[in-house]
Amino acid sequence: GVTFHDDDLIPF
């Protein structure tokens, strides 16, 4: 959910 991960599981 941060950059391209809509799951917010990865801080990338």
From Swiss-Prot:
Its cofactor is Mg(2+). Signal peptide: none annotated. GO terms for molecular function: metal ion binding; xylose isomerase activity. One of its GO terms (biological process) is D-xylose metabolic process. It comes from the Bacteria. Keywords: Carbohydrate metabolism, Cytoplasm, Isomerase, Magnesium, Metal-binding, Xylose metabolism. It is found in: Cytoplasm. The active site is at residues 5, 8. It catalyses: alpha-D-xylose = alpha-D-xylulofuranose. Its EC number is 5.3.1.5. Binds 2 magnesium ions per subunit. Belongs to the xylose isomerase family. This is Xylose isomerase.
